Amino acid sequence: MEFSPPLQRATLIQRYKRFLADVITPDGRELTLHCPNTGAMTGCATPGDTVWYSTSDNTKRKYPHTWELTQSQSGAIICVNTLWANRLTKEAILNESISELAGYSSLKSEVKYGAERSRIDFMLQADSRPDCYIEVKSVTLAENEQGYFPDAVTERGQKHLRELMSVAAEGQRAVIFFAVLHSAITRFSPARHIDEKYAQLLSEAQQRGVEILAYKAELSAEGMALKKSLPVTL
């Protein structure tokens, strides 16, 4: 996926009210960006970080600029726009860049499923194969090259794991897919120190047949793509 038009660079002043961030451009202008991330953004929003933003041509938007990437002061590149996790995963599936998810003839998005009537991110189908249900999570929390999810307690994420276990019990294929959008991460684990219940459910889900995949994206101000499988430790 390529950014078109190219992203623009600025320096972060502050993130506030969850959805807003003030930045200063190289020519000294101060702008307010829309921040499309409701998470804690730990390590992704330190004042002084370089940010890369896109600009919408929609004149009705109150905040036409969107925060897309952070380049931390340690040099790591992080995608902070959580919408890209699903878009990049879909692109990688269609391009058959994810070997574990190759060979299906149909991809559907936002399909209702399960007793709790969740919406699965993707469902893959093919003749003579069980349906494959895929839930995507964006990973940006890093500590010493270790990637973690979640970055805050997530009851919604816990619900998704319960639903996936039900799917696997019915004989369908169930996959939790962690899209790693942080250039410094080399391995993945659930964030037991943040949400112990989620970590417990993830281990239980694996035991009950839910597949766990983690793929890392190549990230730059020019474009992004999921490329590399990472080891997962529960």
From Swiss-Prot:
MF-aspect GO terms: DNA binding
DNA-binding region: 201-220
One Pfam family linked to the record: SfsA
Keyword match Iron: no
Database matches in InterPro entries: SfsA, SfsA_C, SfsA_N
Keywords, ordered alphabetically: DNA-binding
NCBIfam families: sfsA
Entry similarity comment: Belongs to the SfsA family.
Role description: Binds to DNA non-specifically. Could be a regulatory factor involved in maltose metabolism.
Protein name: Sugar fermentation stimulation protein A
Protein's organism: Escherichia coli O1:K1 / APEC
